[in-house]
Amino acid sequence: MDLARSDIIPHLLCLFQEIIQANIQKVSEAYDLELKIMNILTLWRNGSDNLISDNDDYMKKGLFFSRSNDPLALQARYARMYDDLFKLNNYEVPDDVVRRHDNKILDIILKESSVPFWYDISDDEAHESMLPEFRLQDIHEFRLNLKRVRVVPDESEEIQMDESQSDKRRRKKRMEKSRPVWLSGSESDRRIELNDSLKPSQKFETKLSSYLLNRLMNEMNPHYCGHPLPALFVTLIMLKAYSIKNKFFSYGIRYMELVCNEIAGPDLNTRTFPVLFGSDGSFVGTRVYSHYPIKLRMILNDLTYLLTYSDLHKFQEFELDVNDEVLLHMLRTPNDGRQLKKAVTRLNHYYGLKFNPKTTDCGVVNGMDFTHKHPITKTADFTSPVLPMTNSFNKAEICYGHNSKILNRAVFTDTVRGHIREDLKNVADLDLPKLYEHVSKLVDMRVNYTIIYDLMFLRVMLNLGGYSRSNQITDFRKTIDEITKMNEGFLSGADPEKNIDTLNAWMAPTMEDCGYRLTKSILFGKFRKAKYPSDLEAKSNIDYYVTARSAGIGNLRISIETDKRKYKVRTTSKSAFVNAMGSGILDVNPVSNEPMMLTDYLLTQTPETRANLEAAIDSGSKSDSELMRILGQNSIGSRSTTAWRPVRPIYINVLQAHLAQAFIIGPHINATVNQHEYQPTSLWFTGDDLGVGFATLYQSGTADIIVPAIEASSTGKALSVLADCSSWDQTYLTATMIPYYNGIKRALLEYQQADMRNFYMIDSGRTGVPGMKLSEIVDWFNSFQTKRIFNASYLKERHSFVVKYMWSGRLDTFFMNSVQNALITRRIAEEVSLRVSNTGLSWFQVAGDDAIMVYDGSSISTTEQVTRINEITVRNYEESNHIINPQKTVISHISGEYAKIYYYAGMHFRDPSIQLHESEKDSGASDVTESLREFGQVIYEYNKRAIGTLRVNALYGRLIAGLAYSVNCPQYDASKRTYANMKYYPPPTSVIAPAAFKGGLGLSFTGLSLNEVLFIKLHLHEAVSQGLHVISMISFEANEVVSNSLSAYYLKDQKDLLRDMKLGKHLEKVKGISFKSSDLAFSGSDFSQGLNLKRESIDKVKLEVSRKSIRDLRSSGISVPSTHAYENLPYASLHQSFKSLKVDRDTSKFTNERLLVSLLEYKSDIPRVSVTSQYPVYDLINISKVDELNVRSGGPVRFISAPIEGKLLEENIGTRQGVQFKNRGYGGSQEVLHFIRSNGLVITEQALIDLIIKSGVLLMINPQRGLIDLFQSLSGDTASSMHLANFFMAEKPHWEDNAISLTIAGSLLENCDSRIENVKNFVSVLATGMQKDLQRMFYYVGFVYYAQRLIWSGGHSSKIFVSIDEDKLADFLRGSKPITRRRKAMAGTKREPINLSANFSYEISEPDREISEYDPLILCHPLSMPFFGNWQEKYSVMQSDEQM
C-alpha cells in the first residue's frame, strides 16, 4: 500500500476516528473498519505482492506474500516505511512546531558522533554497570558499506537442491569476501582481562570488540514479539487520530528522521534508522552508534505511554512539553536514567503530605484542583487490633472535608520538608524546568485523584527505558561484596550494639519456639491443608514439590531422533528434570561437598593432582558443571526489572536442597497460605497462632490484601509506617535462620513417630544406611545452608561469591523472610508503645521483605512523635543487620506503598511498570500462536491499569498483535527444485477468535475479558465466522508429536493404557534420545529412571483401595478411565511431564503449511463456522431486551489506576465491598487443589470436575458414596477422598461462585461490587422457575455483557434481560451426563421432557434422597467450564505447574 498517495493518511485517520466515535449500535460497522485498517497496514508492511486480492478471500483465507531475499528490495521497502513514518509525523503540523527542538536534536546527534570509538573505551569503562556509549563505525565508512550492500549478488542467489559441497564453499567465500564490515578499526582491537573464578589463573582474556558487541547484543535487546517499525507507525497514527485536531507531533520520531537524514546522505533508499530487527522482533544489531537501540526503545515506549495513559495528560500543552523535555534529556544521556530516578525518589515517597490553606480552601489554584473528594470508610476503627479472618472492603462514602488536621501537620516533619527541598534542587540541577514545575505540584496535599494522576505521569516517564539491562557481574559485585563485608563485621561482633550475639539473644529463642510450635500444630492436625507426608507420599508427590516455587534448575537439553526427523528440546521444566533423574534426585551426596573457592581447593591437592586438574580445566576436558560439583558451588541467575534498576541476582538452589526443604519446612509454608481456618486471637505469629501478619493468608490477587491500610488512609486517623529495606535476602543471616529449623527438629523428635521409620532421602556417601529421616534431613540442611558459594556468569566472565545469608532461590525465602520481618515488627511495636505515648499497633502485614504497620493515631499530635517512630523503626531493622534507608521509611496518615500496591486517601493505584512491547527475555513459546497469546495476556493486564481509553487501548493491542501474526511458509517449486519463501497472515479475525480455535489468539474486543464468545456471537459473528474454518487449520504440532512419541516409547509395555491415552495421529517412532544438562545434579540420566521412581512410590495399601473402588463403581455401571487410575499414576505423570517439553523454535514447524499454501488455489466456498461451535453453552443464551438505566451508585471511585471505562463501571455498579466471589470461589477451589496436590495427581481441577459429572456418580442412589469411590480410585487415599466428597455435598453453592469468580476475577469488574444482590440491579434472567444456582450462572453471563455494553456505550448504563432457550437447555443437560443402568431402571424407558418451571425430580426408594435434574448443577456443572474466560488456554501442563 503506497502511503505516498496524498489521500491515504487522512483516510486512515478518518477510519480510526470513526471507530473511536462508534457506539454499541455501530459495533459491527466499527469492527469492519478495523479489519479494513488491518488490511491496509498489512499491505503497507509487506509491499504490494499480496497473492490474495479479493476482500472476501482475505476475510476467509488471510494474506500471502512472497518473501524476497534481495537485500536491495528489503532495504528499499524499509526505507519507504520509515519515510511514511516521518511523513505521518509531519502531517499537517506547522513547520515551526516541527522544528521547535531541532537545535537540541542536532546537538544530540552531534554528541553521538563525538563519543569515543569502541577501541578507545578503557578497560574500566568496558566493565561499567551500564554499557558505555561508543561508535562502531565512522559515518562515511558506513555509507560506503551501504553501497557495498547494493552490489552483493550472492545474498539473492537461489539455493539449488543439488548444490555440491564445493559449490557451497565457493559461494560462502564469495559472500564473506564481499560482505560489508560494520565495525571499523579492527586493527586497533586489543585483548582485555576478565575475571574467571573457575580458572586456575582466576582470569582470562578476550577481544575488546567481542566483549563490547556481546554486551550490546544482550543489554540492548528489547525482546519484542514483532518488528518495532509497524508498532511505531500504528502508535503514532492512533495518537494523531485521538489527539486534538490531529496535531500530535513526536519529537522522538523527529529525532529518528534527522538521524536518518544524517547517516543516509542523499541516497533515500538507505534512509532507515540503523537498528536491525527480524520480522519476529528478534534483535539483529545496530550500526554506527551503540545506543541507537535503547533510544528507539524509549521512543516507542514514550509514544505507547502517551497513547495508553492519555487521561493523564489529555493532550494538554504543558504535560506534552514536560514529556518532550524528559524524552530529549534521555535521548541526550541514555545512561542517566538512574540519575533521573534518584533525583525524584523522595518526592515519590512523600507526595501530597504538605498541608496548607490551599488544601483547606478546596478550590482550584493555578490550575491545580484542591477539591476535597475521596472515598472514606467511616466504620473503620483502629483504636484496637484489627483481627480479620479475611480482608474485604467496607462500605465507602465520598468525603468532602478534612477532619484530622493534627495528623496532617504531625507527619510533615522538618526532615520530610528537607527531603522534598533536596529533590526539587536535584531536578533543577538537571536543567529540566518543565519537569521541575511538574514535580513541584506533588508537594501540596490534594485529597482527590488529580495528585495521583500527576504522580503517575511522573512514573510513566521514569519507565521509558523499559527493562533495565546491565553488566551483571559488575552489579552483583557492587552489592554482594559490600554486603558480605558488612555481614562479616556483624558476625565478628566488632560493634558491641549491632552483632550476631546481641541479635540472637532475643531472636534465636523466638525463632526456635515458632518453628517448634508450628511443627507441633501441624503434627497434631490443627491445619488440615498442612501435614508431614510419609516417605512414599513424598516420593509420589515429587512433581508437586518441584513446581514453580523452586527457583530453577540448569537447562536440560534433549535430542530426540525419530523415523522422520530430529527434534531439539531445551527446557527448564522441573518435572522433566526430575523424571530424567529418577531416584538420583533424592541423593544428597553429589551436592554435599564443602563449598570452596577454586584457589583454596587447589591448595588441598597434591602437586601432581593439582597440575592435572589445572590442565583439564584449561583444556576444557573438565566440564564446568563437574568442576562446580567438585567445588560445591551453585549458580546465580539474574532478573531484569524496569525503571533503570540494576539487574538482581537470583540464586539457583540445587534440587536436592529444595526437596529437603519441601519435606521439612514445606508444611509450614502450606499452613500459612490461603485464608485462615481459625479466627486469629492476636496480631502475632507464634506457631500456635498464625496471627494476621502473613500476606499469604489474605492473598487473592486484589487490593483486598491490605484493606485495613487503605481504609486507614481514607480516615486520616491512623499512621501507616512503611519500612523500606534493601537487599533483604543478603542481610538475612543464616545464623538467624538455623534456630527455626532446630525448632522443627525438636518437635519432630518429640511428636513424630513416623520419623523413626520413614526414609525420605538418601546419602550414597554413607554405606549400610537405608536413608535419611526427617530429623537427619534437618541436620543435613542446616549444615548445607551454613555456608554456600554461588557463581555468577555473564559473557563468559565468572565470579564466585561466599554466601552466609538467605539466597533467593530457596523454597522458604518468602516464608522465612516474612517470619523474621514479623518478629522485628513486633519488637518495633512494643518499643513504640513504650516510648511514644502508649501508641498501639492496630494492624500489620509482611510480605517477605515488605512491611506495613498501622498505628492508632489518636495519641499522635507532634512531629517529634513521628520522628521517634521513624527512629525506632530504623534502629530495630539495623540492629537485625538489615539495610534500611531512613529517607524511604515513610510515616503517613494518608498514603503508602506496600508490595507494589499504592494508596492515597482511600484511593488505590498501581505503578505503570508493565511493559507492553518489551519482555524481560525471549518468550518460551515454540510457535507464533502461543507467543502472541502470551502477548495478548500482557495487553490485557496492561490495559487494566492504563489510565486511558480502554476501547482505544484494546484496539491498539489488537492491531499490534495482528501485524505480528505471520507465519513463514516454504513453497516448493518442482521445476526449479527450490523453495520460495512465503509469508502468511491468517484471517484478520483470528486476533479476537477464541483460543479454542487452534489459530485463535482470543484477544479482547471490549477490553473487559479474553475470549469474548457471547459478545462476538451477538455483535461480530458475521465477520468472525468467515475465517474460523481456516483459523482452525493453523496448528503447530511439533510439541504434541514429541510428547506423544516419547510416551509411546517409554510406555510401550502398557499397550492398554496407550490405547486409552488416544495419542492420535501425531506420533513418530523414536529411534534415539540423548540428554545434556548444565545442572550440577544431572549425571547422564534417562526418563526410565523417573518412571522407576514413580513405580516404587506406589503404596500397596492405596493400590488395593483404588482397585476395590474401581470394581465397586464398575458394578454400578460406572467406568473410571484407566489413565486416571491410581495404579497408572506413574505413567500418567510421565506423559504429563512430556507435555511440558517444547521444541526449539527452529524445529517447530507450521504443520499445515502445505494445506494453507493450497488455499491460493482453493476455489470453492470456504464454509462459515459458528463461534459457539467450541462453546455450545452460549447457544443457550439470548439477550431478549436491553432497557436504559439512568441510575448510578452514587458512591466513590476507589481504583484510580484503571481506564476511563473502568471508573465508569465502578461509578455505575458501585465500588468493591464485602466478600466478593473471588474470596469464596478461591476458597472452594483450594479444596480440590489440596486433594490433587496432596495425592500427587496429574489431573487438573477442571478435568476432575468434568470427570465427576460425566462419570455419573452424582446420579447414583448414594452419590456421596460414589464420590468417595471415584476419588479413591484416583488417589487410593480414603481420608482425603472422604473429605473432598463431604465438601462437594456440603458446600454446593461455592462451585457456582468459583466458576463465576473466574469470570470476574482479573477483570475490571473486580473493582466493582459484583455480589449477586447488586448484579440483579443490572441483569434480569427470564426463567423464574429455574434452579437458583443455575440462574446465578446466567446472571453473571448477563453481568459481563452489561459491562461490555457499557464500555461501548460511553458509560450509559442498561438493564440486560437474559433469556434461555429452554429446549436447547434440556437437550444440553441430557447430553452432558451419562444415563447409568441404575438410573434407567429408576426412570423407565420412556423419558419425559424436563419441566424448567419446577424442580422436577425422580422419586426413589432410599429414604430422604431424591435425584433432581439440577442436582449436578448445584455441585459443578459443565456450564461452568466456558466461564474460565480470563484464563488463556495453554498447552497441557501439570496441575502443580499451573498453580504458583
Swiss-Prot record:
The keyword Transmembrane helix belongs to this UniProt entry's keyword annotation: no
Stretch list, region Disordered: 156-182
InterPro entries xrefs: DNA/RNA_pol_sf (IPR043502), RNA-dir_pol_reovirus (IPR007097), RNA-dir_poll_phytoreovirus (IPR014383)
Gene name of the record: S1
GO cellular component, one term: virion component
Reactions the enzyme catalyzes: RNA(n) + a ribonucleoside 5'-triphosphate = RNA(n+1) + diphosphate
Protein name: RNA-directed RNA polymerase P1
Residues in RdRp catalytic domain copies: 690-897
Protein task: RNA-directed RNA polymerase that is involved in both transcription and genome replication. Together with the capping enzyme P5 and protein P7, forms an enzyme complex positioned near the channels situated at each of the five-fold vertices of the core.
Keyword Cell membrane: no
Keywords: Host cytoplasm, Nucleotide-binding, Nucleotidyltransferase, RNA-directed RNA polymerase, Transferase, Viral RNA replication, Virion
Subcellular location: Virion; Host cytoplasm
UniProt GO MF annotations: nucleotide binding; RNA binding; RNA-directed RNA polymerase activity
Enzyme Commission numbers on file: 2.7.7.48
Protein family per UniProt: Belongs to the reoviridae RNA-directed RNA polymerase family.
One annotated GO biological process: viral genome replication
